[in-house]
Design a protein with these regions (language model features):
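C-terminal helical cap(s) of enzyme catalytic domains, especially alpha/beta-barrels
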Residues: 2-42
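Beta-strand/loop-dominated core regions that host nucleotide or nucleotide-derived cofactor-binding catalytic loops
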Residues: 9-12, 19-23, 27, 64-158
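Accessory interdomain/linker segments of ATP-dependent helicases and helicase-like nucleic-acid enzymes
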Residues: 35-87
Length: 158
């Protein structure tokens, strides 16, 4: 999986597949879990889901639409400037788009991979704010190490 796809795609697909395999092996597989995995998988690049060639379908029969059917899309916000390891906080430059408290974010980078988080807190000049404006440098708590020049995106409903 993941040929020519972003780190968020690889992270989501591999996580879902791993959880599915583990649940089959430990006997905890349910239709509810399958539905949750399908929902998560639908957030990243896909052309719809089908039963595959095992059900006798041929190429071209598996989707009615052309292109990506992901339910979420990435919107570039900016980049990481610095990571403060003792605080678990990243300083980010808000360059392309704004974001608000509570939005779903994604940080990607060559070493970072894909890090999903919610904007639970935003600080501008040490003060809490509800919205990060273009041109600002803000700090946000992050769950793990990020690196300078990692890209920051918000995930919005497609």
């Amino acid at each position: 999986e993941g040929r020519a796809r972003g780190p968020e795609y690889v992270h989501t697909v591999v996580s879902c597949y791993k959880e599915a395999i583990e649940s089959v092996l430990d006997g905890s597989f349910t239709e509810e879990k399958k539905d949750k995995w399908d929902e998560r998988l639908s957030t990243v690049f896909n052309r719809g889901f089908w039963d595959g060639y095992y059900q006798g379908q041929k190429m071209g029969e598996w989707t009615k639409d052309y292109g990506n059917k992901a339910t979420e899309k990435k919107v570039l916000i900016g980049k990481v400037i610095k990571y403060f390891s003792r605080l678990g906080v990243a300083e980010v430059a808000v360059e392309a788009n704004t974001f608000v408290k509570g939005e779903k974010l994604l940080i990607t980078g060559n070493s970072t991979g894909a890090m999903f988080l919610n904007a639970e807190e935003i600080r501008y000049e040490l003060n809490p704010v509800d919205k990060a404006e273009q041109g600002w440098r803000v700090s946000i708590p992050v769950p793990d190490k990020v690196r300078p020049n990692d890209k920051l995106f918000k995930l919005v409903v497609n």
